[in-house]
Each structure stands twice: as structure tokens, then as C-alpha cells.
Amino acid sequence: MIQEIIEKKLHSELQPSYLKVINESYMHNVPPGSESHFKVIVVSDSFAGQRLIGRHRQVHQILADELDNHIHALAIHTYTDEEWKREQDGAPDSPMCMGGGH
């Protein structure tokens, strides 16, 4: 449910050429079926001319309600179409959870 909301909002606001939303909650100390830890890979030319912090702020603004109420952790990987073409291995893997709850 949360994953679908993330996908819909990012598609609507950024019109990405590529979008992947990955629920990484299983990598953390949370109950099975949780939707609390996500990784997003967004490729959109709307990021052109923006620094990394500006891109992340834009994603945070789009997902503000979800971040306030549902999402505990969000790994964000943003690219323009040109940057994505140069990216040989795609976005980096997320690290495994080091413990702690939530």
C-alpha cells in the first residue's frame, strides 16, 4: 500500500523515465510485511541543473506525508536521463541493518 502510494506520487510529480521503489523493510528488525524502509531510484530530467541536496529535497517534499506518518527510512538515488545512461551498475545496494528497532 505505501509502496504504491510512493510510486504514484513520484510518477505524477516527476514523470520519470525510470522509477523503481523497493521495500527494504525485510532487511531490518521489523515485523514481516512491514512497509517502513524503502529505496527509490528515480530517473527524471526534472533533476537537470539541480544539486543532489535539491533533488532529495524535492523527493522529500513529494513524500512529506508518508515520511511523517509511515516511512522510517528512505534511501534516495536520483539521476537525470544522461546520468543514468553513464551509470554502469545502477544504484548502489543498501547496507544490511545493523540492529535497532523500527
UniProtKB/Swiss-Prot annotation:
A molecular-function term among this protein's GO annotations: DNA binding
Keywords, sorted A to Z: DNA-binding, Stress response, Transcription, Transcription regulation
GO biological process, one term: DNA-templated transcription
Annotated region described as Disordered, given as residue ranges: 83-102
Superkingdom per UniProt: Bacteria
Listed GO CC annotations: cytosol
InterPro entries xrefs: BolA, BolA-like_sf, BolA/IbaG_stress_morph_reg
UniProt family annotation: Belongs to the BolA/IbaG family.
Function: Transcriptional regulator that plays an important role in general stress response.
NCBIfam families reported for this sequence: PRK11628.1
Protein name from the UniProt record: DNA-binding transcriptional regulator BolA
Source organism of this protein record: Vibrio alginolyticus
Organism ancestry: Bacteria, Pseudomonadati, Pseudomonadota, Gammaproteobacteria, Vibrionales
